[in-house]
Amino acid sequence: MAGLLDGKVAAITGASSGIGEATVRALAGAGAAVALGARRVDRLTALASEISEGGGRATAVELDVTSSDSASSFISSAQSELGGLDILVNNAGVMLLGPVEGAPLDQWRTMVEVNVLGLLYCTHAAVPVMRSAGAGHIVNISSVAGRSANAGSAVYNLTKFGVGAFSEALRQEVSSAGIRTTVIEPGFVDTELQGHNEHPAVVEGIEQMRKSVPEVLQASDIASAILYAVTQPQRVDVNEVLIRPTGQRR
């Protein structure tokens, strides 16, 4: 039986774990050739080998999304190694929470560079390729934090609100070229993201939120939403998907 994405090429950033890894598995399982980008090359290589041994096509590319040159090379590698680029999933991200007052400025810089500039750089490299092909799909991973701001997450909110704004403006620019744009906004997902935080109040708040939700989302839940969006007919442009675990209030 033919896969829904047979003949398609997808590039996924932040592919070494969490939502990125789950998305690689979901898209490859539907028949797509996948380019895996992240800094942890050992994990990428192992995952790409697993996909290839299962009969799929995959290439692992060391990627630092904060470098425009690295982002451009990643997109070029997808083209040269796999034969094109149909889908880009901008998943790489970090979440470093805490109050504005006294915040380590390097953490703010990291979030802006990874969550915003990284997404911009990869998109900038991908759009001309997709425009030339007459079609494409860009999926940007935002968050519920891109819809509602809360104390203790000001700069993370800023980055994710920015993802939403950029995605809508991009949609207006490129939809006439056959390029679709989707923003995915997950709630609490069981990934490494929460473990980036060290501020005691933040760590406690995350743990309390986890306890307040009967069952948090899994990375595969988000990957399923991405697969849904990218397998719709070309006439269907799924622009926004908000996903919370049942019981999450905010």
Where do the language-model regions lie?
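Conserved glycine-rich cofactor-binding loop
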Residues: 9, 16-17
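Conserved glycine-rich Rossmann-like NAD(P)H-binding loop of the short-chain dehydrogenase/reductase
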Residues: 30-47
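Substrate-binding pocket helix/loop in short-chain dehydrogenase/reductase
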Residues: 99-100, 104-109
